[in-house]
Structure formats: C-alpha cells, structure tokens
Amino acid sequence: MQRINLYPSPLTPLVNDGTGDITHGDYDVAIDNLEAGTYVFAADIQNSRAQTGINVMLFDSDWSPIFNSTEIGHVKTTFTLKKPDRVRIRAFQVGVTISNVNVERADTYATAAGGGFPAFFTKDTAAY
C-alpha cells in the first residue's frame, strides 16, 4: 500500500509567536475528511522560549484532545478515530515551531517504517 502524507503542507511549519494573529503564524491546521481508523502523527518540535509545558496538541472536530506532548525534538504517536472526523494540529505555546509533519494511516506507516528490502526478496535473492 502506498504511503500518503495527509498533512496538507508538510514543508510549511506551524509557528506560535503569541500574537494571536494568523498573519504571524498563530494558527492551527485541520485535516478534513479522515476516515475512521488508526493514524500516525510524527513531527519535529522546537521551542525557542519556554522549555516546559505542552508544545503540540491534536484535537478532533469537537475540540476534544487526542494527543499532547511536552517533548522537544522528534515526536511520534498513534491515534484512532472511531468515526470519520477532522484532526486539528496546534502549536500550543509561544515559541513553538512544528515542522516536518507527517500524518498517515498506521497500516502504511508501519510497513514503510521497517525499511529493508521488499518482502519478495529472500536472503538468497537480495542484491547485497
């Protein structure tokens, strides 16, 4: 199965500069029309100010929290949607930048993340 990043613009970071103004990057991104199922969220989190507290949060369409992280660096989690829904990704505090965002179905992520040769190779047919 082909890997598809469902995040609309993976090379555009989410930034929270504390102004509350969308022109300065204070915004969240919604991924609409996700089917029910299990997904992987992975991203790089930087924080140029406070190094404590929640840096990133994921919400569903009812603003119910799905995930939050206080980590700096590469963050990865899985989450399950019980019904078709929307997921919002928000840089949660001033100074946070979220980049290299990947949101994809867990079944495609798991097979690709293992790396190595495709399953049709064996130890005798692999091109070492």
Language-model regions, residue ranges each:
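Extracellular beta-rich ligand/substrate-recognition surface
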Residues: 15-27, 66-69
